[in-house]
């Protein structure tokens, strides 16, 4: 199938992938008097007395704002907010289908950090959570940090944390399959943008042995002048051997390769220099850093990609619906590290020892167990860490 051509045809036919539907009857005068004036004044007064009542008397409790500035849309780059709208609508549709979360797209005409933060903050009282989407690095880090400080609702940049959570789940099971200890594993991550840095942080939080981050300019190491502030910070806490050089150098002897970068930049010869029973997560879309057959030719034992037409698809849809469902169910004020770790462990645990194989390290996107399992784990972690409000 020509997905580009067929998708364009369907988008013209659909005229949008989401819509607003009423949850109340509007058939007669009494219906209107209860849903709108004069009856609606009473819930307004209740909320005026206690803003938290907005979660009980409106749909706020289940509403997620999906925000972009159009600066990093999929692999298309900075195409602008309007051009990002089809992706945001699609994200909202997935929130509803996989987590029963009501999501609303917001495409902001600005690339200014403070302007974006202020815009979102000013309307945050209508929502239970904020999902940041397709915002370029390093601005995305600053936007998330400032919003988290200002807002009393969860803020989650899916390109960072959703990717990190599902990668960590997949690596947990891949290491289990090849009988290697998480704490001894050596990782190379190619792509030191929002996803790569967040993956690195979560793996370190989980106790991975060592991580080397690689950017288009080379290995992140203290003293490299080309690094941005986020990369400089990561250089101080990674790369224990203080390696310098390129990706080829970084891959030698590594147990794991994680790619969130560009197509066709890894060869089977490069994979052959990795440790025995190597694990390769080549997640560039639509064309991975190395095709699975080439990675296996180089000696990779487990291979994962971001694509649905190969085994072991690493897909954020396993994460964000359940994370927000769990956060909303306990009215969490934040999505903290413990909640992210809980989500990752919940996903990994769905693959039993009997089911585990080289081609089955992660649940399928349509596995109906995933959303509820993630939501339950996230809600429990929110309660344990004191960010649950009900």
For each of these PLM feature ranges, what is it?
Residues 150-166, 282-285:
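Short, acidic/small-residue loops that bind anionic groups at enzyme active sites
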Residues 105, 131-134, 155-158, 189, ...:
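General beta-strand structural signal in soluble alpha/beta enzymes
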Residues 1-155, 375, 381, 385-389:
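N-terminal ligand-binding/catalytic initiation module
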Residues 232-301, 307-309:
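Rossmann-like adenosine-cofactor binding region
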Residues 158, 180, 282-390:
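Adenosine-phosphate binding glycine-rich loop
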Residues 12, 55-60, 96-97, 122-124, ...:
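Solvent-exposed alpha-helices and their adjacent loops that cap or buttress functional pockets
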Residues 74, 79-99, 157, 161, ...:
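Glycine-rich phosphate/diphosphate-binding loop of Rossmann-like nucleotide-binding domains
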């Amino acid at each position: 199938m020509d997905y580009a051509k067929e998708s364009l045809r369907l988008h013209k036919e659909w005229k949008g992938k989401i819509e607003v539907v009423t949850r109340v009857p509007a058939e007669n005068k009494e219906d209107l008097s209860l849903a709108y004036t004069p009856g609606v004044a009473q819930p307004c007064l209740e909320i005026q007395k206690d803003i938290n009542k907005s979660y009980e008397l409106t749909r706020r409790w289940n509403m997620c704002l999906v925000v972009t500035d159009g600066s990093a849309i999929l692999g298309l780059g900075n195409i602008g907010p309007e051009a990002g709208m089809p992706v945001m609508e699609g994200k909202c549709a997935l929130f509803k289908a996989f987590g029963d979360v009501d999501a609303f797209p917001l495409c902001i005409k600005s690339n200014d950090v403070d302007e974006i933060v202020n815009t979102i903050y000013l309307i945050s009282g209508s929502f239970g959570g904020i999902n940041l989407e397709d915002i370029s690095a390093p601005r995305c880090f600053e936007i998330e940090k400032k919003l988290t400080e200002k807002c009393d609702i969860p803020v989650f940049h899916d390109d960072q944390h959703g990717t990190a959570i599902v990668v960590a789940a997949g690596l947990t099971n891949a290491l289990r399959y090849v009988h290697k200890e998480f704490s001894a594993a050596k990782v190379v991550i190619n792509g030191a943008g929002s996803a790569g840095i967040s993956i690195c942080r979560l793996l370190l939080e989980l106790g991975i042995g060592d991580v080397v981050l690689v950017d288009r300019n080379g290995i992140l190491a203290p003293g490299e002048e080309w690094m941005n502030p986020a990369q400089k910070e990561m250089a101080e806490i990674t790369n224990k051997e203080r390696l310098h050089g390129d990706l080829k150098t970084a891959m030698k002897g590594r147990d794991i390769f994680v790619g969130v970068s560009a197509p066709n930049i890894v060869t089977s010869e490069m994979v052959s220099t990795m440790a025995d029973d190597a694990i390769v997560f080549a997640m560039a879309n639509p064309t991975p850093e190395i095709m699975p057959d080439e990675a296996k030719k180089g000696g990779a034992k487990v291979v994962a990609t971001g694509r649905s037409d190969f085994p072991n698809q690493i897909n954020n849809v396993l994460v964000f619906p359940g994370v927000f469902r769990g956060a909303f169910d306990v009215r969490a004020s934040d999505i903290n590290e413990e909640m992210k770790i809980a989500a990752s462990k919940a996903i990994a645990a769905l693959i039993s020892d009997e089911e585990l194989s080289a081609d089955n390290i992660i649940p399928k996107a349509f596995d109906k167990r995933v959303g509820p399992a993630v939501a339950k784990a996230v809600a429990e972690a929110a309660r344990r860490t004191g960010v649950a409000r009900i």
